[in-house]
Amino acid sequence: MMLKTVLRLPVCAALLALAAGCAMIPPEPVVTGPLTAPPPPPPQPSARPNGSIYQPSAYGNYPLFEDRRPRNVGDIVTIVLEEKTNAAKGVATNTSRDGSATLGVAAAPRFMDGIINDKLDTDISGGNTANGTGKSSANNTFTGTITTTVIGVLPNGNLQIAGEKQIAINRGSEYVRFSGVVDPRSITGSNTVSSTRVADARIEYRSKGVMDEVQTMGWLQRFFLIASPF
């Protein structure tokens, strides 16, 4: 009796570990990498500016006669999310096949009259018909705004941007993540750019909380769904 109890303990522990591992599998993130620019190095002491009208230290690294569009690491760009996709697919297949065969004996030896008689007059026919149809459609709309940070500048001048917005409501939280590459010439004077003009755009919208847990299938239900042969 003691031996059976000892043998059952590892089995129960393995089942509990398996259940804990399958309890909640977090989805893989779409946006990977840093979501903000690294902190800049501490400023070096410089000589006191003596200009009476224009002082470079008061305007950063921007020239006097150029706008303040983002061009350096750490600058801010506002992305206007205007994603809308529509996809539809339809398939129709019709096949048909007919066949026939006739077999008859016009003459046979006399000693086989009682055996054959009229049984060899055979007519065989067959047909095969198959019809199949399929249709699928998908619609996706995502609108909003998110402010990102320039995390890198490519050799050709394009900007690598990334950002995250988190919103906590009651006991749940939602976050939007965005990353991509944007041409500085696409940025408007109000420091905004449409998401449709961002290359390699990755948009992620996730939620955590009670509503997200309700939409997730339980681990035991997933186990029986995988093990079921039907």
Swiss-Prot record:
It holds the Pfam family FlgH. It comes from the Bacteria. One of its GO terms (biological process) is bacterial-type flagellum-dependent cell motility. GO terms for cellular component: bacterial-type flagellum basal body, distal rod, L ring; cell outer membrane. Residues 34-53 are annotated as: Disordered. Residues 1-21 form the signal peptide. Keywords: Bacterial flagellum, Cell outer membrane, Lipoprotein, Membrane, Palmitate, Signal. Residues 36-46 have a biased composition (Pro residues). InterPro entries: Flag_Lring. It is a lipid-anchor. PROSITE patterns: PROKAR_LIPOPROTEIN. A lipid is attached at residue 22 (S-diacylglycerol cysteine). GO terms for molecular function: cytoskeletal motor activity. A lipid is attached at residue 22 (N-palmitoyl cysteine). It is found in: Cell outer membrane; Bacterial flagellum basal body. The basal body constitutes a major portion of the flagellar organelle and consists of four rings (L,P,S, and M) mounted on a central rod. Belongs to the FlgH family. Assembles around the rod to form the L-ring and probably protects the motor/basal body from shearing forces during rotation. This is Flagellar L-ring protein. It comes from Bordetella bronchiseptica (strain ATCC BAA-588 / NCTC 13252 / RB50) (Alcaligenes bronchisepticus). The lineage of its organism: Bacteria, Pseudomonadati, Pseudomonadota, Betaproteobacteria, Burkholderiales.
